[in-house]
Amino acid sequence: MKNKEADTELESRLLEILVHPCRIEDIRRELPNAGKNNLKNALDALVADGRVMKNKKNRFAVSAHYGCAAGTYLATERAFAFVAPDYPEGEAKPDDLFIPPNASGGAWHGDRVLVKVSERKNNRGRKEATVIRVLGRAGKELTGELVQRGKAFFVQPTSKKYPEIAVDKHDLGEAAVGDCVAVSISHYGDEQFMPQGVVRADLGESGTMEAAIAAVLHENGVYDVFPNEVLEQALAIPQEVDMGTAGKRLDLRDKLIFTIDGDDAKDFDDAVSLEKLENGHYLLGVHIADVSHYVTPDSPLDAEAFRRGTSVYFPGHVVPMLPFALSNGICSLNPKVDRLAFSALMEVDKDGRRYGAKFAKSVICSKARMTYNKVNKILAGDKGLREEYAFLVETAETMNNLAHALYKRRIERGALELDIPEAEIRVDENGKPVEIRFRERGESEKLIEEFMLQANEAVAEYMCKRELPTVYRVHENPDPDKLRVFASFARPFGYRIDPSKPEDTAQFQTVLRGAKNDPKQRVLPTLLLLSLARARYADECIGHYGLKAKFYLHFTSPIRRYPDLVAHRMLQKALLGEEFTAADETMCEEAADQSTNREQAADNCERDIDKLYIASYMQQFIGEEFDAEVSGVQSFGVFVALENGCEGLIRAELMTGDFYQYDEEHMAMVGRHTGKRFTIGTPMRVKLLAASDTTGQIDFAPADGSLPVSEKLDRPRREDTDRAPRGNRAERRRHSGKGRGGKPGKGKKPPTRKRR
C-alpha cells in the first residue's frame, strides 16, 4: 500500500536523517529543538509502523538500510504467500515479495508485516523475504463452518487463506455444528498452540447460499440492522417538510423539476431542471436531497453513516447507509411533494460552456418521477409517452441536446470514455436469479451522467479555488510501468502509445475510438482500465485523471455516500461565511480515508455476492457448451467469460493437448510444444463443469481439445476508476436498463466484462 504522509514534520525530518544509522544522541544533535518526549514519540511511531528499525547497537535507521521492508501480507490457499511492500506516494508500485513456506512469522492474510528481504529469487524471478514481525493485525473476525471432532470444536474459515480456529465449548453461543458462524480471534496461535476464537454470530446453515451471502456481508463489515438509537432518531424526524424549521431557502416549487431514475429505484436523491435565459444561455439546475438538514454532525445518524460510508447494493437487496425512513422517505425527492434540496444552478451555453454557478439551500416539488426507459422512449419519439408527458417533452429534448454538447466538450478536453459493458442480474419475487444481461446506457442515462458531472465539478471548483476544506474525489495519473504493458498489447493493432506521457490522453482516446468500431479490439478498453489507478477520496484537490477534470468531488448522492454529505456541509458553511477550523480539516481527512475504505469494502461485497448469484443461475446449464473468451490468465489456469458476463476458471491441468506454461510478462498460457497461446481475448469453446452458489466458483473445461477457436494477438487485465459520476458500480445496479437476457448464447461471441 502507499505510505501515508508523515503525521508530523518531525517524522518527516527523522526519515531524512535516518537514511544512515544514528544513535539517539546523534539524532538529538540534529534536532535540538524537538524535545525529548516528542522525539521519543515520533521514533516509537516510526518503529511501530515498520518504517524505522533499531539494531543491536541501538542505532536507528530506515528499514531499507537493514534490508527490510514493511508491507501487507497476502496469503494464498497454498503454503506460500506474498507481501506487497509499502511505497511512497507518487512512486511506482514495487513488485510483491515471495514468502516461502514456514517464513510467515505467524502473519495472517491482510496483516501489516515487517520482512527481511533476501537476494534469493523464486522460480518466477520474485525476490524472497521472511516475515520478522507482525506490525498490525488486519481484523479480528472471520467467518466459517463450525465443526466438531471428538469433544473439540473448530471453525474452518470460509477462505482457505486462514488457518483453522479452535473454539471452547463455552464460547459457541447459540451456534450448532454445521452452522456458518462469525468468530472473533482471541489468540493468533504460535508454535505450541493453534489459534483460539469465540463465536460472535450465527449466520445460518453452512452450505446454503443465504449463509454464504451473510458471510460475505459480515466479512466486509456490512450490517443490515441499525442500532436502536439511530432508528429512534430517524423515526422521530417528521415525514413532511416543516418550512418553519427549514431555514431561509430558495423557493423553486413552481419550477419544472423532475427526477430520472431506474424502474426499480426507491430513493431519489437528484432532480434536474433547465430554463432558457434572456441572453440565450441555459440555467441548468441539479437539485440534490438536503440530507445534511436531517443528519447533523455528531448525531447517532451521522456516526452510523460515517461507519457505513456507503450503501451496498446486490441483486434484489440494498443495505442502506441511512435508515429507510430517510433514504426512501423524507430525503427522497418523491414526486408531487415538497422536499428540501441543495441546488446547484449553473449557467451554460448551447455548446456546453459553463459561465458560472451558484449554490443554495432550496425547497422543490418534483413534477414527475421519470424513468430512464420512459425518457429514452420519449426522446425516440414514442407517441403515447410524449402525449402523457407533454409538459416536459420540450425540456427533455433540450436537456438531451445540452448533454451531447457537454459530453463533446468533456471528450475534447481529454476525458476517457471507457464504456465497458457491465452485467446486471435480475431476480424474481423470491430472490432467485432468473436473468443475466448487460446493462445498456441510453440517452437519458448519459444525460443524467453529464448533468451530475457538471454539479460535481462546479462545487469542487468553488471550494478548491477558495482553499476551503472538503472531501474531493481524486484520480491520479497511471503508473508508467502499467502503461508500458498496455502499450505492448496495443502495438499490434497499430497504436503507438508513449507511456512516459500519461497526461496525453488523446493517445488513449484514439484506442477507445478504434475499439468501438473493431470487434477484435474490444478487449483494449478493459486493458486500459487495468492500467489506470483506482479513484479515491482525499482532502486535497489534485484533479481527476479519467475525467480530465481539474476540480472534482462527489456532491450528488448524499443519501448513499458519506463524502457527498460532507461536501454539502462544507459548502453550506462556505456559503454562510462561517469560519473553518482545524477540526473541519481533520474531519475531512478522516472522512476521506473512511469513505475510500468503505467503498472498497462495498465493491468487494457486491462483487463476491454477484458471483454467488451468477453461479446459482448457471447451475441449470451444467454440462452444456458455450462460446467464451479468455478474460484473464494466471499460473493456475485461464479465466473465461461468456457473452452474458458469467466468468469462470479453466484449471491448467484441464488444458490438454500440450504442456502449458504461464508467461507472466505477456499474460499468456503457452503450449511448450505447439506454441498455442491463450491470452486475453482468445476465443474458446468451453463446457460448464460446475457452479457453486456457496463459493461463487464456476469451473469450465475446453470443449474442443484445449485449442483456441482462432489464434489472436496477445493482450492484459483488470481494476477500477470512476465510470459513472453518480456512484460506483453498486449505484448503477440500482437502476434498470435494457440488454440481452436469457440463456448464455451458444455460438455468440461474448463482450468484454468489466471486473472490479
Predicted features and spans:
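Non-cytosolic beta-sheet module surface loops
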Residues: Y73-A75, L146, V630-G632, L642, ...
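Intrinsically disordered, low-complexity linker and terminal regions at domain boundaries
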Residues: R651-T694, I698, E711-E719, R723
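A short macromolecule-binding patch
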Residues: E91-I99, Y162-V167, C646-Y662, S710-K712
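A generic structural signal for residues embedded in beta-strands
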Residues: V115, V183, V633, V686-L688
